[in-house]
């Protein structure tokens, strides 16, 4: 990534100049959003100018504790069978790819795709996340995939978390059969509208906070809240998805040290590679709320070194076009010292009792009795208007609906199969499908 310092250019119309600068920032922001944290750090470290910055040097050179589960950006060959970990017992489900008609690509990630699929026996629609085992093993991410599965199994009863119907695997792929949500990513709607009015932002923030509070009650820290991971359902309610970076078994006073997340939303303590706790999720909620109100994350800069420095050192700047309650909430959530951050003492209870949420009846919110401020107006499962054409225009790979011929199964595929023992899951027969 090229580090550039923007120069001031005089313009006769100050309003136009500011607008042009905002559009340029938004354009750069959209291009960088799909970059993974590892790629981001690699490009940052490869830039000689950025590496001279003291805060960047601190980020790149700090050595984490030995027990830290670091995300390894250096590809390595799949481990040998003797190094495989049995990642949990499970029943052997009867599900297989040929049970589905795979209709459209509706999302993409580092390890595979998300597809709209229709089950052939009952014609119900699902979002099926299909991941390549070899790609996961190459980056040593099998623990994160199993963590996602485990978290999904715990989320089936919460209204604002995507539900897992079942999971299964073939010799070379993993399949998550998930709720199909077609109201679009929050990121997609922010791209189109740039920012939201405060009542709409409050509604979304409340539903997000409810979902995070539920995860925390299960001792799960989400760690990757961003508009791309927040979906709208067909009525306009929030659905949180993508649990690959969740950390399980974090007690109320517990901490972890894994360096992971999305660059624009990393809390200061994560950047410093210090132990962090549940309050990283409240920092991210503040960042997303700020973005909903203003159009960009709070400390965003096209200069990557400057952005990290802003997160660590720059005071929060709030424009006057929001209420005092919104200002107070953002100041509490985006507190750089986690011990002073809103939510540090009493977690979700502090958030929902904040005056910004005083118009919210939380019981009605969780019962979905509150009318969403925006209705996606989808006409049915085949209505894909809120998905990015970059995805939906892509052809569905033929390999998605089948497994390798048994005669062509290689040793690496065999090792991949052993790495994901316990992945497959099927519910009790009376709830199956």
Curated annotation (Swiss-Prot):
Biological process (GO) annotations held by this record are: apoptotic process; inflammatory response; intracellular signal transduction; neuron projection morphogenesis
Please indicate if the UniProt record lists ATP-binding as a keyword: yes
Reaction equations catalysed: L-seryl-[protein] + ATP = O-phospho-L-seryl-[protein] + ADP + H(+); L-threonyl-[protein] + ATP = O-phospho-L-threonyl-[protein] + ADP + H(+)
Enzyme Commission code = 2.7.11.1
The residues annotated as the active site are: 224
Q: Which residues form the AGC-kinase C-terminal domain?
A: 358-433
Q: Which residues form the Protein kinase domain?
A: 100-357
| Region Disordered: start-end pairs | 66-92
The broad enzyme category this protein falls into is transferase
State where it is primarily located: cytoplasm
Bias kind Polar residues: ranges: 83-92
Q: Where in the cell is it found?
A: Cytoplasm; Nucleus; Endoplasmic reticulum
Residues binding ATP: 106-114, 129
Q: Which GO terms describe its molecular function?
A: ATP binding; potassium channel regulator activity; protein serine kinase activity; protein serine/threonine kinase activity
Q: Which InterPro entries does the UniProt record give?
A: AGC-kinase_C (IPR000961), Kinase-like_dom_sf (IPR011009), Pkinase_C (IPR017892), Prot_kinase_dom (IPR000719), Protein_kinase_ATP_BS (IPR017441), Ser/Thr_kinase_AS (IPR008271)
Provide GO CC annotations from the record: cytoplasm; endoplasmic reticulum; nucleus
Q: Name one Pfam family in it.
A: Pkinase_C
The entry sums up its family as follows: Belongs to the protein kinase superfamily. AGC Ser/Thr protein kinase family.
Q: What does this protein do?
A: Protein kinase that may play an important role in cellular stress response. May be involved in the regulation of processes such as cell survival, neuronal excitability and renal sodium excretion.
According to UniProt, the name of this protein is Serine/threonine-protein kinase Sgk1
The record lists the organism as Danio rerio (Zebrafish)
Query: Which gene is transcribed and translated to give this protein?
Result: sgk1
